[in-house]
Amino acid sequence: MTLPEFFGCTFIAFGPPFALFVFTIANDPVRIIILIAAAFFWLLSLLISSLWYALIPLKEFLAFGVVFSVCFQEAFRYIIYRILRSTEQGLHAVAEDTRVTDNKHILAYVSGLGFGIISGMFALVNVLADMSGPGTMGLKGGTELFFVTSAAQALSIILLHTFWSVIFFNAFDTNNYIHIGYVVFSHLFVSLITLLNANELYTTTLLINYLVTILTGVLAFRVAGGTSRSFRKFITCQ
């Protein structure tokens, strides 16, 4: 059963992001480059977080590392925002589809998905490697829900990073500091809540994280200009 669980959890975590990539990014080279660049910047934030966690006192407290990791991620989200905004004219000149620069929310969406995919991969890839077989006993006989929960958490963080970038980029464009604060503090909140998984409170963390994901998705939809009317047209394929 290890191999079916491996594929099941892989599709739970990366199925929707892969579909987003195929249908909205894969046919545009500029979007692919932006996605890869965003993933690279997230890796830089992870590198700095690792160095900080290794060198600074209090590193025995995991929450300490989580807080600074979130701060570094948001700092690099701002850096890529500044880079994309400063290179819009160049992107417009080389882009086959000019919507990528004409609609600023597309840049935010693509970079956010890049952030999310690489974050989800680093969160889940070791777990996927362990579940692919052969079967092993947990050190303390952990619950069988661990793998599915990890996959669901990874999907949540991928979607959240996508939504956060849409909100974050627009907030700086419009000087909306409330939305900037929402992105930073909801990222902190979701990350710290996952620490409860150490006590096997999986139901609690999943419910809270997906509630935040839904609320953040609605906010990102409204920020991007979505309305209830446009949502109904989307659902009914009009």
UniProtKB/Swiss-Prot annotation:
GO annotation terms (biological process): amyloid-beta formation; membrane protein ectodomain proteolysis; Notch receptor processing; Notch receptor processing, ligand-dependent; Notch signaling pathway; protein processing; protein stabilization
Listed InterPro entries: Aph-1
Chief place where the protein resides: membrane
Signal peptide: none
Keyword annotations from UniProtKB, A to Z: Membrane, Notch signaling pathway, Transmembrane, Transmembrane helix
Superkingdom of the source species: Eukaryota
GO cellular component, one term: recycling endosome
Task performed by this protein: Essential subunit of the gamma-secretase complex, an endoprotease complex that catalyzes the intramembrane cleavage of integral membrane proteins such as Notch. It probably represents a stabilizing cofactor for the presenilin homodimer that promotes the formation of a stable complex.
Similarity-based family: Belongs to the APH-1 family.
Binding partners and assembly: Component of the gamma-secretase complex, a complex composed of a presenilin (Psn) homodimer, nicastrin (Nct), Aph-1 and Pen-2.
Protein name (database record): Gamma-secretase subunit Aph-1
UniProt organism field: Drosophila melanogaster
Upper lineage: Eukaryota, Metazoa, Ecdysozoa, Arthropoda, Hexapoda
